[in-house]
Design a protein with these regions (language model features):
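N-terminal strand-loop-strand
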Residues: 1-19, 46, 50, 75
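NUDIX/MutT-family hydrolases
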Residues: 70-72, 80-114
Length: 124
């Protein structure tokens, strides 16, 4: 797999590109939810989770007030769009798509400020 930032193109509104992610199921840890959501949306098995940050601006999602806990991870396998993902792309930090959903441009800017391009993948 190419090294880079894995993004999905959303099937549902709001449309655009986003970091893979979703909601935590009852009784599930944040880390387990990140692993499950990555598998469901990208077909990748992830490991080596490292916390990037938490994002809680009430305006980050127009549908409801959500809080995202964002992890950086290594992905294993052949990536393919699945579940809520229409498409999947692997991007370099300097060539991200223009239409990013939610506050993912801010999250990716935080990633770029903290890490060099040799790290692979971002997963909330």
């Amino acid at each position: 797999m190419d090294r880079g930032i894995v993004l999905i193109e959303r099937k549902n509104e709001p449309f655009g590109w986003a970091l893979p992610g979703g909601f935590v199921d009852y009784g599930e840890s944040l880390e387990s939810a990140a692993v499950r959501e990555a598998r469901e949306e990208t077909s990748l098995e992830i490991s080596n989770l490292r916390l990037l940050g938490c994002y809680s601006d009430p305006a980050r999602d127009s549908r409801m007030h959500t809080i995202s806990t964002v992890y950086i991870a290594s992905g294993l396998g052949i990536p393919s769009a699945a579940d809520d993902a229409l498409n999947l792309g692997i991007f370099r930090p300097d060539s991200l798509p223009e239409r990013l959903c939610f506050d993912h441009a801010r999250i990716l800017a935080d990633y770029a400020a903290k890490y060099s391009t040799h790290h692979s993948g971002l997963l909330p």
